[in-house]
Amino acid sequence: MSEQLPTVSDLLVSSAASLVNLAGIRLTEQEHKDPAAAKEAIEAARALLPLCPEEAVAPIKEALSQVQMLYVKETDERAKARSKIWTPGSP
């Protein structure tokens, strides 16, 4: 019985989906939170999208857009939290 190897398309889709999942984990799970790593995963997934088969692009794009919104929310909240930090000379 011979084992069938995955196609390049299968691996591209799997890799893009894994990167989107990793970005989500890096943004939502407290013990793994790392917005910089999430951004890197988002950018890598976006780079793979043009190489993925057309039928797989829409679901990955949808998940990616949700993760990108989480990233914007997370980084915006961090920026607001930093702006509330008292510094000498500020009221």
Regions found by a protein language model. Name each.
Residues 1-44, 58-66, 70-91:
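N-terminal intrinsically disordered, cationic/polar leader segments
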Residues 43-55:
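Short, charge-rich amphipathic interface segments used for partner binding and complex assembly
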